[in-house]
From Swiss-Prot:
InterPro entries: Ribosomal_uS19, Ribosomal_uS19_bac-type, Ribosomal_uS19_CS, Ribosomal_uS19_SF. HAMAP family: Ribosomal_uS19 (MF_00531). It is found in: Plastid, Chloroplast. This is Small ribosomal subunit protein uS19c. Belongs to the universal ribosomal protein uS19 family. Its main location: plastid. Keywords: Chloroplast, Plastid, Ribonucleoprotein, Ribosomal protein, RNA-binding, rRNA-binding. It comes from Populus trichocarpa (Western balsam poplar). Gene3D superfamilies: 30s Ribosomal Protein S19, Chain A. GO terms for cellular component: chloroplast; mitochondrial small ribosomal subunit. One of its GO terms (molecular function) is structural constituent of ribosome. Transmembrane segments: none annotated.
Amino acid sequence: MTRSLKKNPFVANHLLRKINKLNTKAEKNLIVTWSRASTIIPTMIGHTIAIHNGKEHLPIYITDRMVGHKLGEFAPTLNFRGHAKNDNKSRR
């Protein structure tokens, strides 16, 4: 279900403050965040944001094509290694 157009996109306040602070200084430092639910907005373009995937922070460079998506979409939390080759023990 999509978000209502009457509401603004969700961006965590601490993340928005950090981005605005870096934009006023015209710096491009790494921003570390746990907020995977935040929506990417146009002021984030050009920044590198390290998004937590449950184990570590993955640095993601924000481009204009990412605007409107959530930060968590670009940091996968699961890595599927494939099914077991010989699974005879569990077949019984």
